[in-house]
Amino acid sequence: MQKRSDPRHQKRISIIKNLFSYQFHKKQTVKGDAKEVVAKLAKVDKLITKYAPSWPLEQVPPLDLAILRLAVFKLLNKKDLPYKVTVDEAVEIAKEYGSETSFEFVNGVLGTIIEKELGIKELDN
């Protein structure tokens, strides 16, 4: 589990806050690393929609969506970062800030994307 004082953890929280806010204020200027995510939002959202078909984006809780957007972006664009790290980060943030079931939803969607899009079958190895 990431420590709250870990600068990388704090950076991810900051990006998620920006993405969360962006959902409600699309005309606002997105700050820092969140700009990269917003630039690829169409592709990221398409994958989330594809692998969470029972949950249209407008029905996904906004915090869960912000967490997923960052994680999916990282899976697609940050190949030097192991996918397990990306999933662990997202799940821990969902546990810390989301609802009781947020982490399960985030983990399920990310696991499916990893299997179907990245071709990785066994996530536990």
Predicted regions span which residues?
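N-terminal interaction/assembly modules
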Residues: 1-97, 103, 109-125
